[in-house]
Amino acid sequence: MDSDTHAADGPLKDGIFKEYFVDGTLSWEGEFRAGEKTGEWKYYLKNGRLKASGHFVAGKMSGPWTWYRENGQLMQTGQFVEERKDGVWRRYHPNGALHDEGEYHADQKVGEWRTYDASGALIKTRQHRARPGSAA
């Protein structure tokens, strides 16, 4: 039996669930419906700070997701469509300045991606095209 989708007593998980680290701090919280992750989910670091948050639809990452560093600063934002990166993604330097940004389609970088130094100055642009034969 898969403990990720089944409750301790056997049936598929249904409802709000939380899991804890060995030390008792919250590791994650979210909802299952018929054994599949659904709705908003939050994942935490051992220091208690939020690590990531986003949504699941029918067990797959969907919609906007956000990740954070151990100190709580924003690390990355992006979108998923059925567990695949799709839409604008941004990563941030530890000082909070934008590191890079661009777009994904079906898990592939497409179009212009821009990279910035820690002071915010544009240092590189690169064009990406979908690989032949891909779903992009």
Show the residue positions of the predicted features.
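Glycine/tyrosine- and acidic-biased, solvent-exposed loop/turn segments at the edges of beta-strands
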Residues: 1-136
